[in-house]
Amino acid sequence: MSDKKKRSMAGLPWIAAMAFFMQALDATILNTALPAIAHSLNRSPLAMQSAIISYTLTVAMLIPVSGWLADRFGTRRIFTLAVSLFTLGSLACALSNSLPQLVVFRVIQGIGGAMMMPVARLALLRAYPRNELLPVLNFVAMPGLVGPILGPVLGGVLVTWATWHWIFLINIPIGIAGLLYARKHMPNFTTARRRFDITGFLLFGLSLVLFSSGIELFGEKIVASWIALTVIVTSIGLLLLYILHARRTPNPLISLDLFKTRTFSIGIVGNIATRLGTGCVPFLMPLMLQVGFGYQAFIAGCMMAPTALGSIIAKSMVTQVLRRLGYRHTLVGITVIIGLMIAQFSLQSPAMAIWMLILPLFILGMAMSTQFTAMNTITLADLTDDNASSGNSVLAVTQQLSISLGVAVSAAVLRVYEGMEGTTTVEQFHYTFITMGIITVASAAMFMLLKTTDGNNLIKRQRKSKPNRVPSESE
């Protein structure tokens, strides 16, 4: 392999890390600025939720298409298109003069966001042998952990000392740098052409949109609960129709043969089950600290920083842990630990010393980081190059929806305890944390289906290896 091509492949993880950082930052920085944007556009803060929902639904709808587009036109072409759309959408959002304009431009942003990270990860899957994939994905995930810490703080700073427009303008230099770097370092992997499954796209895409909408409606109590549940049931019906369609179609959008890969099926179901519990922490903890303990919003937001810090520190140790314990023992054990850590938040009180609140959050961050890395890599471990794009899309969709599902479930549990007479606000949060902890511990049973040898292809040592294939210069 030439030195030029080696440098090109070495730059690929940096491109994926940039994409992850942009998405993670954008997901958290906007919430802080919503009141300021609402004031500038002469709308109520509640109405600004449409700017968030429009992006979320667009991403949910188009993630499944990202794999087909990358297979058909190449990873470099689609990735540069995605970053371009995300960057131009950010510029347009900053220039918006009304809420309808902002919503439209957020949709454009969402089109880019739906393809950016999945295509970058697909390129990694095809470029690196499985035994090199774990440390590479670890590296890529780190900037994504910094984004949620930096987002709320940076959003507050920009709104306070500049204007809300800079919330979007900050994406532009990052996007331009990403484009230049991608043109130089992103390989243009393609596969054999296959016909686009338009019927499958409509069934699967609408199912995801309705499911996301139903969860949002249920969690935010925007409409009556029965309406939200009807939307969710309809989405499940469309998903069942897609399954029937996929069985009769030679080349469906998402092949059902994926789920014949045992580690993939366990990883997907495990992602959904465990994130029901872990997804509640960023939602419940700031609420309990503010509503129950009386903390100020800024302090409550900063209290989540130890979780992200623990996640970053744990990334450097995940590979060693997996090599020592294996995937099965690691995932079962760490999921039980996470469940116990979530449940122990029921022991916290306003009178506790601040370090007694910070330390459990730090430990939880380390545990969650280990779990997510192990869970995501075992899901992709045994996929072939032919089904890597579809499997990667399913994983991205699962991650997108399961976080919302975790928030909705924990909100529903909290509402149940709020209806109990004779309980204080703090006790209601305590009972909710105990319930979500039990759910998380129970989800560990899913990973007991793994064999002790599963994932060995990811963690075995190799003296010298190289990426699977480097495209020719013509690609």
From Swiss-Prot:
The lineage's top-level taxon is Bacteria
CDD domains hit by this protein: MFS_LmrB_MDR_like
Q: Which membrane topology describes this protein?
A: Multi-pass membrane protein
Q: Does the keyword Glycoprotein apply?
A: no
| Topology Periplasmic: residue spans | 31-49, 160, 219-221, 415-428
Kindly list the biological process annotations in GO that this record carries: transmembrane transport
Where is this protein localized, as stated in its record? Cell inner membrane
Q: Where is this protein primarily located?
A: membrane
Keyword Cell membrane part of the UniProt annotation: yes
Q: Which Gene3D superfamilies match?
A: MFS general substrate transporter like domains, Multidrug resistance protein D
Please list every transmembrane segment annotated in the UniProt record, as residue ranges: 10-30, 50-70, 78-98, 99-119, 139-159, 161-181, 198-218, 222-242, 281-301, 302-322, 329-349, 350-370, 394-414, 429-449
**Record's GO cellular component terms:** plasma membrane
* Keyword entries, A-Z: Cell inner membrane, Cell membrane, Membrane, Transmembrane, Transmembrane helix, Transport
- Which GO molecular-function terms appear in the entry? transmembrane transporter activity
Cytoplasmic compartment ranges equal 1-9, 71-77, 120-138, 182-197, 243-280, 323-328, 371-393, 450-475
Pfam families, sorted:
MFS_1
Protein family membership: Belongs to the major facilitator superfamily. EmrB family.
| Miscellaneous comment text of the record | Overexpression causes homocysteine accumulation and reverses rspA-mediated suppression of rpoS.
Q: What is this protein called?
A: Probable transport protein HsrA
Species of origin: Escherichia coli (strain K12)
